[in-house]
């Protein structure tokens, strides 16, 4: 088995969070009621756990995710109405092509790829 890391994201509304991540390309692979496991079958994995009242203030949510994908534009097209930065996706000074969205609990989700070094 390869090593991998999986984020466990708290959510006060699992149905809303599930719908959001499905738009990004995830699907539910296991549902335990208050705990759901999502994947895209290409390498992304995510666990959602129900935490009532989390976060108290959405803008105070300290969590973030970076989802690497080759076809950034295809994912952006599925969530274009949610993209935070106008004109995104675009190249960033730190060498990525990316965009950002916020999930229903305020988790910052960046979707991008590393630009060619050539």
Give names to the regions the model predicted.
Residues 8, 49, 93, 100, ...:
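Short beta->alpha transition motifs characteristic of CBS
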Residues 22-29, 83-84:
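Conserved acetyl-CoA-binding loop of GNAT-fold acetyltransferases
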Residues 12-15, 65-108:
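Vicinal oxygen chelate
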Residues 1-16, 63-65, 112-118:
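N-terminal beta-strand motif that seeds the catalytic metal site of vicinal oxygen chelate
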């Amino acid at each position: 088995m390869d090593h991998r890391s999986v984020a466990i994201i708290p959510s006060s509304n699992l149905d809303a969070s599930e719908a959001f991540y499905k738009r990004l390309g995830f699907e539910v692979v296991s549902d335990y009621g208050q705990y759901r496991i999502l994947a895209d079958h290409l390498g992304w994995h995510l666990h959602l756990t129900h935490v009532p009242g989390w976060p108290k203030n959405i803008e105070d949510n300290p969590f973030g995710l970076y989802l690497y994908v080759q076809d950034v534009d295809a994912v952006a097209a599925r969530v274009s109405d949610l993209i935070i930065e106008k004109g995104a996706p675009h190249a960033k000074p730190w060498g990525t092509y990316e965009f950002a969205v916020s999930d229903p609990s305020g988790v910052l989700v960046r979707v991008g790829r590393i630009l060619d070094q050539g």
